[in-house]
């Protein structure tokens, strides 16, 4: 069995024909987060994936096997939720609550994509978003899953937060509420990079 133990850095340019001829390793997101994995190439060949710990593979990555051969990574179709909203404010609130729960999210133009989760689907629907189950490749934003506590200062935000907590309490039977009230205004703008095409900010007043 061949061992795949190296990933070529994204800034290294390879001939397109060379990459196209390489066999594909098609993996769902959960499998792409594992540095040790027994996998099967699309050709049917079994391989062992042994990469540095903490490696998260992305669609289009090129790997190198122990015999020097190339293998290209492809994101598999998997069960996901497509989240849309009638306005930017609702979608932003949905994104906030997903981020507050450390949920990996792929950001698109007017749409959020996350791994299928019926609890999150229920929460997002109650927040006013439209949630559709689909089968699609999932490639969330890299390195953007920091957690956080609520810093809302307006009644509408507090209602949204309480609703989100209620949904999770119903499903899990206990509360994880983290409330921090302040007497001063503050504003935290978080730019989400070039993939965030709809100018997604988290501003709190």
Swiss-Prot record:
Disulfide bonds: none annotated. Keywords: Chaperone, Cytoplasm, Nickel, Nickel insertion. GO terms for biological process: protein folding; protein-containing complex assembly; urea metabolic process. SUPFAM superfamilies: Urease metallochaperone UreE, C-terminal domain, Urease metallochaperone UreE, N-terminal domain. Pfam families: UreE_C, UreE_N. Its main location: cytoplasm. InterPro entries: UreE (IPR012406), UreE_C_dom (IPR007864), UreE_N (IPR004029), UreE_N_sf (IPR036118). It is found in: Cytoplasm. Residues 170-205 are annotated as: Disordered. Involved in urease metallocenter assembly. Binds nickel. Probably functions as a nickel donor during metallocenter assembly. This is Urease accessory protein UreE. It comes from Burkholderia pseudomallei (strain 668).
């Amino acid at each position: 069995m061949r061992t795949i133990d190296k990933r070529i850095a994204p800034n290294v340019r390879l001939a397109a024909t060379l990459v196209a001829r390489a066999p594909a390793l098609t993996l769902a997101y959960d499998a792409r987060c594992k540095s040790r994995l027994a996998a099967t190439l699309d050709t049917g060949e079994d391989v062992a994936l042994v990469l540095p710990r903490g490696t998260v593979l992305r669609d289009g990555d090129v790997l190198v096997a122990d015999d020097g051969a190339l293998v290209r990574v492809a994101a598999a179709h998997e069960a996901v939720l497509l989240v849309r909203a009638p306005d930017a404010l609702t979608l932003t609130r949905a994104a906030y609550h997903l981020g507050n729960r450390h949920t990996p999210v792929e950001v698109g133009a007017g749409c959020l994509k996350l791994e299928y989760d019926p609890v999150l689907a229920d929460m997002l629907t109650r927040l006013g978003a439209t949630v559709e189950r689909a089968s699609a490749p999932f490639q969330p934003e890299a390195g953007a899953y920091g957690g956080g506590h609520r810093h809302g200062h307006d009644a509408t935000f507090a209602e949204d937060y309480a609703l989100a907590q209620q949904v999770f309490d119903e499903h899990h039977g206990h509360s994880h509420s983290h409330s921090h009230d302040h007497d001063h205004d503050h504003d935290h703008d978080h730019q989400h990079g070039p993939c965030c095409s709809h100018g997604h900010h988290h501003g709190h007043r």
